[in-house]
Structure formats: structure tokens, C-alpha cells
Amino acid sequence: MTTGSKAKRRLTILGSTGSIGQNTLDVIAQLGGRDAFEIAAITGHDNIDLLASQAKACGAALAVTANEDRYQALKDALAGTGIAAAAGRNALIEAASIPSDWVMAAIVGTAGLAPTLEAARRGADIALANKECLVSAGDLFVRAVAEGGGRLIPVDSEHSAIFQALEDDQQHAVERIILTASGGPFRTWSREQMANVTPATARAHPNWSMGFKISIGSASMFNKALEMIEAKHLFNVRPEQIEVVVHPQSVIHSMVGYTDGSVLAQLGCPDMRTAIGYALTYPSRTKLDVERLDFTKLARLDFEAPDEVRFPALRLARTAMERGGLQGAIMNAAEEIAFHAFVDGRIGFLEMADIAEAVMDQMIATGTAETMDAVFAADEEARRRAGVLVAQREKAA
């Protein structure tokens, strides 16, 4: 860990090859790179060329691929550099356990749960971009952060906005959390049109540059559904205090409403590097090379209520929060299976929500999220059931 004002901060990036990870390395480079930071470890999955290139560029001590079959390729790519290579699930957890001041948790999906939880237990400040930590194991994760003594700083643009708009010592005065949503590429489409959506069409986000999974999650509004559950755990609010408003321009990233009628909002151009930079330098702010918001060029800012008939994921999030227990983990796992089935052309776009809801209803009596074993068991069973439903629909088509 760092000591002294001039010591380099020690960082770990879990998920460096994804969209968030790449933007994180860009921010680190802007803020001084090797002169200001020591990179303890970076991790990726199948993109070995990019992972090795990143490790060399940032001077990481360790590079880890989650795919054990790619270990030799990574080792060969790093030969002669002095950078250690490792592979597999246990290697991810070991990378997360390396003492660091700050950990970017950007591994997508439930694969990020165990390593992020380990980093939290070790006392690092966690810049959280992985949704599943809070959606599937919110109480466990928040408790691990508290026990570890680190800080939890959200990186999602919406949660970062809320984090910034929350006034110190005014939690008691928070009346509502207002998450904004662009509405995605199908905001004005009918259900009939959405039934014929292809993965390529769903991938096109109108405002943000993001990865494939997140882009399709934005199109279905499942991302927003997960963010609702995250907000409940991050900001210790009741489900009924969480609102979603569609804001097509994505200029207002989210808002906090207070009991005196005031609403505080965080605005900016849609660029993930702003939220990443804030998380990296919190509680300070620093100069970043990102586009500045020009109010004179904003012709209008529009807002509308979300249509939960066309976008039922929002309703499912409320159901999961009301039921509690493992419903968040179940919803997330079932949606992941449905997502892959949609991408593979096995089911339609609208069927993703149908499958998630069906599995949630089937597993309504499943226990509580008291342990990671319980979370993983529910996740595994939800995936199995979702797979069965996908196969049934595919056969009936």
C-alpha cells in the first residue's frame, strides 16, 4: 500500500480488455501513467494480444487470463518482459488479493463476483463497474466492503452521478433516486417491430460507446433494471424511492431528489472516462481530456416515462427487489442465458424478458443470499432452468 504523498498509487484492473478496462487504462495514461501509478495486475479473457499489449504498455507486474486454455499464449506473448502470466479462476482471485490501493472491478458477469469480493475483503478502494456484485450478492458485497475498510465508488455513469449529487450527511433527506435512461435504439419502436430485432441492430447505442453485452442490455433496458437493484444497495434506499426516467440525450446522467423539493443532477457529455477518472481520484477531481458540455449547443433536453410493457425488465427489477432474497441473482443469471440465446439466433429479442420472468417465478421460494455458495447455487440453477426454456421455445418455433 502507498505511504507518503509522493508514493505511487498501486492499482489492479479486473477486466482490462473490456470497454471499461480500456477506458480505465486511457485515464491512467492521461493522469501520469507509470510515473504516477504502479499496476499490480490486469486481467482479461480471450483477447490475449490486447491483454499482453496492455501489460507491456502500463508496466503491469502480472497479467491474468480467465481462460486456462490461453495460458501458454499469454506466457509466450509476455516472454522476456519480466511480466508474470497466470490463468484460470483461482488466478483471478489471487490477482484480486494482491495488496492494492484501488481496484477497478470491470469483469462482466458473475465471473467478476469472487475476485471483486476478494478485493473488497482485502481493504482496497473498489471502483465498481461489475453489476452482478450488487445485483446478485448486494448485502454480502456491501458488508465485505465495510469489513475490509475500503471505499466503494460506483463507475456506472448513472450511479456515479448519484454519488456526486448526494450531499454529505444528508442521506436522511433523500426522497428519491432518479436514474436516467437513453431509451436505447428502440425507444420509439412498437412491440411488433421489436419482435424482429436482430443482435446487430440491438448493439447500436445512440449515445454511448460500450461493449456488446452492455449495448444489448441497454436496448432491452435490462441494464437499467440491474442499475435499479444496484442503486438500492449502493445508496441504502427503498425500492419505492427508485425512479427511472427516459432522457434520450444522455446529458443528465442521473439525479437525487431531496425532501425539501430540491433536485440535484450531474451533467456531462456521454464519456465513461469522466466517471472512471472521478472514481480514480476521489475525493479530488483532476483534468481529463474529454469533450466539454456546451450548453449553447443543447437545443433541448427531453424526458419521458419508460414504457414497461415494451421494456418489462424494469418491472422485473421491482419484482426482484420486493421479493428480495436471491431473486436478483436469479433474474441476472436467467437473463444472461437468454442474452446468449438471442445473440445465437435461438430466441427473439422480446423473449429474453419472458425467460427471465418465468425462471424468477419458478424459483420464488429459493432461499436467501447469506453466503456466496447460496448465490452461486441459485445462479447455476437459474441458468439451467433458463436453458431448458430456451430449448423449449427453440423447438416450438
UniProtKB/Swiss-Prot annotation:
GO terms for biological process: isopentenyl diphosphate biosynthetic process, methylerythritol 4-phosphate pathway involved in terpenoid biosynthetic process. Keywords: Isoprene biosynthesis, Manganese, Metal-binding, NADP, Oxidoreductase. It is an enzyme of class 1 (oxidoreductase). Its cofactor is Mg(2+); Mn(2+). 1-deoxy-D-xylulose 5-phosphate binds at residues 131, 157-158, 182, 205, 218, 223-224, 227. Catalyzes the NADPH-dependent rearrangement and reduction of 1-deoxy-D-xylulose-5-phosphate (DXP) to 2-C-methyl-D-erythritol 4-phosphate (MEP). The keyword Cytoplasm does not apply. Pathway: Isoprenoid biosynthesis; isopentenyl diphosphate biosynthesis via DXP pathway; isopentenyl diphosphate from 1-deoxy-D-xylulose 5-phosphate: step 1/6. SUPFAM superfamilies: 1-deoxy-D-xylulose-5-phosphate reductoisomerase, C-terminal domain, Glyceraldehyde-3-phosphate dehydrogenase-like, C-terminal domain, NAD(P)-binding Rossmann-fold domains. Its EC number is 1.1.1.267. Gene3D superfamilies: 1.10.1740.10, NAD(P)-binding Rossmann-like Domain. NADPH binds at residues 17-20, 47, 130, 132, 211. It catalyses: 2-C-methyl-D-erythritol 4-phosphate + NADP(+) = 1-deoxy-D-xylulose 5-phosphate + NADPH + H(+). It comes from Rhizobium rhizogenes (strain K84 / ATCC BAA-868). Belongs to the DXR family. Mn(2+) binds at residues 156, 158, 227. GO terms for molecular function: 1-deoxy-D-xylulose-5-phosphate reductoisomerase activity; manganese ion binding; NADPH binding. This is 1-deoxy-D-xylulose 5-phosphate reductoisomerase. InterPro entries: DXP_reductoisomerase, DXP_reductoisomerase_C, DXP_reductoisomerase_N, DXPR_C, DXPR_C_sf, NAD(P)-bd_dom_sf. The lineage of its organism: Bacteria, Pseudomonadati, Pseudomonadota, Alphaproteobacteria, Hyphomicrobiales.
